[in-house]
């Protein structure tokens, strides 16, 4: 059992013990909500059991709903921890002023998880989860970074590199999103495009059509790709020919050299540490 699975269970149980059980609801409803909270917390485990690694075959509505609820439970857990920490820190003061109350189970009329604060925390968690999902699903904004490189040859001054990372193409992002990312990247008119891993969340049999828009990425000196950990789970060897057909130059502990106005520029790419889990070559910067 992984650490993530154990911690997810802890989150769910914390929400149950600190929010659901102390409430004034009847026991059948408490049981239903407790199981629901635990299922939401264990979203990653349930996804793997039902839909396989990374949920490549999960329908988009299920992916969105489960992701939203998992995030909400996670945020609710953090809010409850913050609240309980505040109660513990202020306990000496409240005790000295006669305002103390039991941290866990108190009298029926003084349960800390009931009433206004419980409703407020749940509502805040749902709202923050919704905001986070909206931000995650929008086309990412362009972030421009100007680098000062001492001794840079004049021929390379102003060389423009567009970096794409963690696209995680899968059931969550639709075709419009993928097309917009490509269009926005091309509009920058980069000299070189580098894709630094975690392009896909699934196998080619499921996602080859979804990654097709990446073939429209255009740069004067081409598109270079180095894998991330998410390429290894579904099978990196299956994805390599797909990436190459999309026009990407794949670098795995390798380098390639381009000439910019007659000046050589070496581009190196390494594998991900996840390769070691599959008996493949791990990252080797010296070799690259």
Question: Across the structure, where does each feature detected by a protein language model lie?
Answer:
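Non-catalytic terminal accessory segments
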Residues: 1-138
């Amino acid at each position: 059992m992984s650490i993530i699975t154990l911690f997810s269970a802890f989150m769910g149980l914390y929400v149950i013990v600190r929010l659901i059980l102390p409430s004034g609801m009847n026991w059948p409803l408490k049981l239903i909500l407790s199981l629901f909270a635990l299922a939401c917390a264990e979203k990653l485990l349930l996804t793997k059991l039902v839909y396989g690694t990374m949920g490549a075959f999960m329908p988009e509505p299920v992916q969105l709903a489960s992701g939203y609820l998992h995030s909400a439970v996670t945020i609710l857990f953090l809010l409850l921890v913050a609240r309980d920490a505040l109660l513990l820190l202020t306990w000496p003061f409240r005790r000295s002023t006669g305002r103390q109350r039991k941290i866990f189970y108190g009298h029926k009329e003084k349960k800390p998880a009931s009433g206004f604060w419980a409703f407020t925390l749940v509502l805040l968690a749902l709202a923050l989860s919704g905001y986070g999902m909206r931000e995650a699903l929008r086309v990412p904004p362009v972030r421009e970074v100007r680098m000062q490189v001492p001794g840079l040859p004049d021929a390379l001054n102003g060389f423009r590199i567009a970096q794409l990372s963690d696209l995680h193409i899968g059931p969550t992002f639709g075709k419009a999103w993928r097309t917009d990312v490509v269009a926005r990247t091309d509009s920058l008119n980069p000299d070189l495009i580098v894709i630094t891993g975690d392009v896909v969340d699934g196998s080619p049999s499921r996602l080859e059509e979804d990654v097709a828009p990446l073939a429209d990425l255009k740069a004067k000196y081409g598109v270079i790709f180095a894998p991330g950990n998410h390429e290894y789970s579904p099978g990196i060897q299956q994805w390599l020919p797909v990436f190459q057909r999309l026009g990407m130059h794949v670098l795995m502990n390798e380098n390639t050299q381009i000439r910019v106005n007659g000046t050589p520029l070496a581009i190196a790419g390494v594998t991900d540490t996840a390769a070691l889990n599959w008996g493949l070559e791990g990252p080797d910067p010296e070799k690259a």
